[in-house]
Amino acid sequence: MHMIDLKKLVGSKVRIVDIDDITYEGIVDEYIDAEDNVPEEIEAIILTDLLRLDDGKKFINPIEFKATEIISAYSI
């Protein structure tokens, strides 16, 4: 698995594929540095306006994705 620079995605609309091979689209609202993500110490991003493309489910609340849960992430 290659490293994705999650920090560069802040403010972008993105498509993410997670480790369960589920695809999402949303806006990257926030980046959390590994040092600030206690107790996991894993970098993460928080997405808003999230849509799970596999079944069309829309999420009302922001959702956090840890770097270890993301297979691919790119701006769309």
Residue ranges and their predicted role:
Residues 2-76:
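Conserved RNA-binding domains used in RNP assembly and mRNA/RNA metabolism
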